[in-house]
Amino acid sequence: MISEAPPFWWRKADWRAWLLLPVSFLYGRIAGHRMAHGRRASVAIPVICVGNFTVGGAGKTPTALTIARAAKAKGLKPGFLSRGYGGSLDVTTVVDPDHHRAVAVGDEPLLLAREALTVISRRRVDGAQRLVAEGADLIIMDDGFQSARLAIDYALLVIDATRGLGNGHIVPAGPVRAPIRQQLRSATALLKVGGGNAADRIVRMAARAAKPYFTASLKVRGDNTLAGMKVLAFAGIADPAKFFRTVESRGAEITVAKSFGDHEHLTEDEIDDILTTAERQDLLIVTTSKDFVRLSGHPGKAAQLAEKCRVIEVDMVFEDHLAPSLIIDRAIVACRERRLREMKAGIKAMPGKAGPL
């Protein structure tokens, strides 16, 4: 999967998109066939997948965290499953936020592990087995909707209302990961994030396909006011502009804005440039929680930058505060129905304790 989304993906299709359409057609055929016909392994506990239609960030990780908190409030032990994108470890691993660094396990798994049991695995089936062995009674997949490796009981697709589907084309002509109709058939529900109208078309398509949708927004955690402050804001996420808007919404004046690639680890020169610029212009340094965890645990200038950063943390807040609990309940029911079908067909789930029924 392409890790960086070219800017033209998020604008009206131009000659670059049209030039790549033949490749997109082939990619879409393969991705759609895999989603429709992939042999999915089954686990004995409910699986919720938080995914999206497109490459890049839409708010999957904050959504997964919100669902995990709702699960814990219901007395469940949720476990996150991630591929560990951006990390170097290629073995199935239980993430320890006090021991591991982002360079090894990825930035998002470190954030998830602060909330609940988290396993990274290049093979999602192996990761799911490990979560069951570790005592999880609910799996929350952060991404992986299109992978067709694991049986999913509830697929929640997150879509950014300000970006939507971009130019609407499939990779590499655009940001869409697989044919939209196939993705909708495999989805359980949509989550529209933010107040824009770029997602209205896909929401209407979902409604015609009898798929429910929820609405939510990203809210800054705590009283993190920046009123009247001049700041240097840096972000290495899929949509840095969204972070910069969030900073400005807190009353800050962004004097310097620096964007880096999603999941990118800063070089010593880049860190030095941020520190020097902020000191020379007397600026407060602000960044995202993902960028902060990539700095944490490193010596030298990375530690200096981490110490000087103001971290702007955000939470995914559902308009209907009961929605996360409802999603969990629906996943549990779907898991029970899946297991009954498998029992009748003589299919055995992977070993592990039975999920909540």
From Swiss-Prot:
ATP binds at residues 54-61. One of its GO terms (cellular component) is plasma membrane. Pathway: Glycolipid biosynthesis; lipid IV(A) biosynthesis; lipid IV(A) from (3R)-3-hydroxytetradecanoyl-[acyl-carrier-protein] and UDP-N-acetyl-alpha-D-glucosamine: step 6/6. One of its GO terms (molecular function) is tetraacyldisaccharide 4'-kinase activity. InterPro entries: LpxK, P-loop_NTPase. GO terms for biological process: lipid A biosynthetic process; lipopolysaccharide core region biosynthetic process. Its EC number is 2.7.1.130. It catalyses: a lipid A disaccharide + ATP = a lipid IVA + ADP + H(+). The keyword Cytoplasm does not apply. Pfam families: LpxK. Coiled coil: none annotated. It comes from the Bacteria. Keywords: ATP-binding, Kinase, Lipid A biosynthesis, Lipid biosynthesis, Lipid metabolism, Nucleotide-binding, Transferase. Transfers the gamma-phosphate of ATP to the 4'-position of a tetraacyldisaccharide 1-phosphate intermediate (termed DS-1-P) to form tetraacyldisaccharide 1,4'-bis-phosphate (lipid IVA). Belongs to the LpxK family. This is Tetraacyldisaccharide 4'-kinase. The gene is lpxK.
